[in-house]
Amino acid sequence: YKPGNVVLRPIILKNSQDYIQSKFHTGVNPVDFVFHGGSGSTLAEIREAIGYGVVKMNIDTDLQFAFTEGVRDYVVKYVEYLKTQIGNPEGDDKPNKKYYDPRKWLRDGELTFIKRLEQSFSDLNNLNTLI
């Protein structure tokens, strides 16, 4: 989503935690929150929300777009190789099978997907946290 369309206000999370903690005499951050609609939020907002009890953030929209970016970039790069089975800028008799093979362009989608996942792991302070 376009930055600014979804406005994250972490102070609401803090105030909710403080109220519940005060009312029920619990420990710090007694409620686990899920962060819906994180697309377009700044890293500072995400980190602040985590500090106030966010334990899950939905990133599906960002991941879908990241996968599509890889496929799109592949198609743009090899468009002249994807128009016919035989014949490309290298010659009229040159085969194009290795370019339109789905394993090639799907892999480019996977690589941009992985890159976006790694960014999310970093943003969410979740690098190297599994034993």
Region roles according to the model:
Residues G4-F33:
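Alpha-helix-loop-beta-strand connector modules within alpha/beta enzyme cores
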Residues P10-Q17, I46, I114-F121:
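Generic structural signal for well-ordered alpha-helices
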Residues V31-G37, V55-I59:
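Hydrophobic faces of well-ordered beta-strands that scaffold small-molecule active sites
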Residues G37-S41, T61-Q64:
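Glycine-rich beta-alpha junction loops
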Residues V71-V75:
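Short low-complexity, flexible loop/linker segments enriched in glycine and/or proline
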Residues Y1, Y52-G70:
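Glycine-rich phosphate-binding active-site loops on the catalytic face of alpha/beta enzymes
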